[in-house]
Every structure is written in C-alpha cells, then in structure tokens.
C-alpha cells in the first residue's frame, strides 16, 4: 500500500483506478476491507482512494496533535495535497462521514460532491457516550478487547438478524482480536473517545451544498438510526436514501444496493 507521512505518522491508503477521484472514509474499528465491494465497482470508472484510520489496518498511530474530528479532516486534506488532488467526491461512513462533512465545511472548494453514510453530525447522546466510554475503560484495563466484549461490540455494526456464523461477522470479530495492545492504547481508544465526545455541528449543515450532497443510512442501523439521517437531510435540504437489509456497515451488508446508489449519484455529480 502507498503511504503518506501526515503529522509525523504513516497514513496508508489504497489508490486504485483512474478518472474523477472518489475518497472513501471508513468506520471506526474497520480497515479498508469495509469498502471492498465499492473499490471493485467504483474503480472501473473512478480513481478510488481509501485511507486507513490511525491505528487501523497498516496506518501508524494517532498523531499526538490529533484532538478533534477537525484534526482528522485537516489530515485528510493534507493527504489530498500530498497527492496533488484539487477536488474529490467524498463518501464517508460513520466517523468517515463525521470528518468528511467537516472537511467539506473547512474547504468547500475541494469538494465536488459529498455522501454521508450511517453517520451523524450531532453530539453523541449521553447514554450511548457513557456506554462506549465504559467499554473503552474495559479495553484499556485489559490491554485488549476481552473475549466477552467481542460479541458485545461486533453486533453493533450489523443488522440485528445477521448470521453470526457468516464470514462477514466472523472476519470482523477476528479483526477485533487482532488489535495490538499498543494500537489499542495509543490509537484506537483515544480515537474512540475523540469520536464519541464530538461537539454538535448540526447548525452548520445548512452551509453544505444541498444539490451535491446525499445522506444514506441502513434501515436497521442501531448506533446511527435512520431518524438521525432524516434530521440531517432536512437541515441540508438534500436527498436521503435508506438502504434495505443493512445495519451500520451498509457498504458490506447490502453492497449491490450501495454500489448502484453511489454510481447513480456520482454519474450526476463527479
């Protein structure tokens, strides 16, 4: 994988295909594999770039000066500068949508179009924030994601009726076990706290271009329920697409639907 040094740390990314650039922003706890079906489909017509989050996949640890989602947005702008890419079509899922929207607000001249999937620009509700922080404390104390937590954390990302013996579920569960102690303590846990203590920026959404923005959400997304996406789409004045038979990682649970929706949107805006 190619690498760019951003804020003193190696940021690894996929760069596949040619054409207008599509930048894919990943979910917390997932590497580039969460976009595998989209990379294959989109790279036939587009140049697809998929950076891996700090502490995830092959990327280095969270840079010391990373204190907010605005910093993540700035770091991804630095990646675009490194690659001499003036404008992108940005597709961000979960935290990828959180920093993606901030990038669009920070540098609107760099954005052709923006797709926010299974994400929310409001603050994390207090109950879920406290719950996630309690999980981070357990992970921190153990220096690993303990076995009992694997089947607490993994289901958060999928629709309720997912087959827990499926390759999709089991591969993700295995990937959670693979995080190193160093990676968890230096990057994954601090990044999680940063994500779930984010400030509310819903009042800024009206600044996004409604004609070149799309909000998408899995119909069965538990951590980011469709009501949040409906709220954001109304504030922006943009289209909303609900993804059937999908939870949080809709890109993997209903890839054909997601691919078709993205290709249709990009054909009109890229």
Where is each model-derived feature located?
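Flexible "cap/lid" loop of the alpha/beta hydrolase fold
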Residues: 105, 112-143
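Conserved alpha/beta-hydrolase catalytic His-Asp/Glu region
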Residues: 125-130, 145-207
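Short beta-strand/loop motif that positions the catalytic acidic residue
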Residues: 208-209, 215-217
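Conserved HGGG/HGGXW glycine-rich cap/lid loop of the alpha/beta-hydrolase fold
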Residues: 9-62
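Catalytic active-site module of serine/aspartate enzymes centered on a nucleophile-bearing elbow/loop
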Residues: 237-270
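Active-site loop/oxyanion-hole signature of alpha/beta-hydrolase fold enzymes
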Residues: 40, 49-92, 260
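Conserved alpha/beta-hydrolase "acid-adjacent" motif
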Residues: 222-228
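Gly/Ala-rich beta-loop-alpha elbow adjacent to hydrolase catalytic centers
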Residues: 92, 96, 100
């Amino acid at each position: 994988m190619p690498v760019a040094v951003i804020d003193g740390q190696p940021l690894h990314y996929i760069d596949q295909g040619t054409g207008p650039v599509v930048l894919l922003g990943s979910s917390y706890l997932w590497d580039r594999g969460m976009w595998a079906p989209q990379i294959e489909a989109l790279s036939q017509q587009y140049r697809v770039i998929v950076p891996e989050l700090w502490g995830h996949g092959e990327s280095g640890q969270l840079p010391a000066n990373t204190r907010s989602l605005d910093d993540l947005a700035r770091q991804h702008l630095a990646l675009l500068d490194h690659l001499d890419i003036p404008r992108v079509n940005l597709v961000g899922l979960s935290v990828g949508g959180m920093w993606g929207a901030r990038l669009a607000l920070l540098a609107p001249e760099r954005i052709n179009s923006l797709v926010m999937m299974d994400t929310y620009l409001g603050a994390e509700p207090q109950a879920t924030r406290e719950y996630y922080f309690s999980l981070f404390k357990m992970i921190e104390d153990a220096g690993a994601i303990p076995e009992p937590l694997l089947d607490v954390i993994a289901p958060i990302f999928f629709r309720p009726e997912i087959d827990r013996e499926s390759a999709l579920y089991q591969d993700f569960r295995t990937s959670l076990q693979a995080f190193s102690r160093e990676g968890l303590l230096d990057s994954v846990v601090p990044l999680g706290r940063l994500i779930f203590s984010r400030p509310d920026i819903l009042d800024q959404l009206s600044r996004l271009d409604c004609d070149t923005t799309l909000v998408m959400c899995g119909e069965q997304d538990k951590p980011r329920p469709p009501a949040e996406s409906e709220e954001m789409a109304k504030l922006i004045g943009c289209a909303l697409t609900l993804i059937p038979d999908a939870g949080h990682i809709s890109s993997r649970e209903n890839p054909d639907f997601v691919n078709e929706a993205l290709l249709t949107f990009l054909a009109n805006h890229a």
